[in-house]
């Protein structure tokens, strides 16, 4: 396995709760895809699931950023270009589109390993970019 990048992020659930209380869940329309919003809204504790998705997106961005000091906007990667999905066995997965997918291809990414965890206090995500052996 050839590791091309790693990213980690932590989001406090209380911050997401406060944003929802202040501005409503619609504030996340610019950050989450329709499928992500639908999933989060279907859960008993939407803020926790929003928080873990935001952490996952940021972890993937950090991994894609690599040694570059560029920000998301400088790389041209939008929040909705990194989507957290679930594979058939229920494990979290990542789908990249647009600039995010182009960046991954340019780095030689063949697979993104994602680990998510959350409590009622915090959500954490770790993303590992994997290239082909020998890259």
Feature map (PLM): residue ranges:
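Core catalytic alpha/beta fold that binds nucleotide/phospho-ligands
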Residues: 1-135
């Amino acid at each position: 396995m050839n590791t091309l990048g790693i990213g980690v992020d932590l989001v406090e659930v209380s911050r997401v709760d406060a944003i929802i209380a202040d501005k409503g869940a619609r504030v996340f329309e610019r950050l989450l895809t329709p499928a992500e919003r639908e999933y989060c809204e279907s859960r008993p504790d939407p803020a926790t699931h929003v928080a873990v998705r935001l952490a996952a997106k940021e972890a993937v961005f950090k991994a894609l950023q690599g040694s570059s000091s560029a920000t998301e906007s400088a790389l041209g990667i939008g929040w909705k270009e990194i989507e957290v999905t679930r594979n058939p066995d229920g494990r979290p997965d990542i789908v990249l589109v647009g600039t995010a997918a182009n960046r991954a291809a340019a780095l030689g990414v063949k697979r993104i390993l994602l680990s998510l965890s959350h409590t009622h206090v915090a959500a954490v995500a770790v993303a590992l970019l994997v290239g082909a052996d020998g890259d």
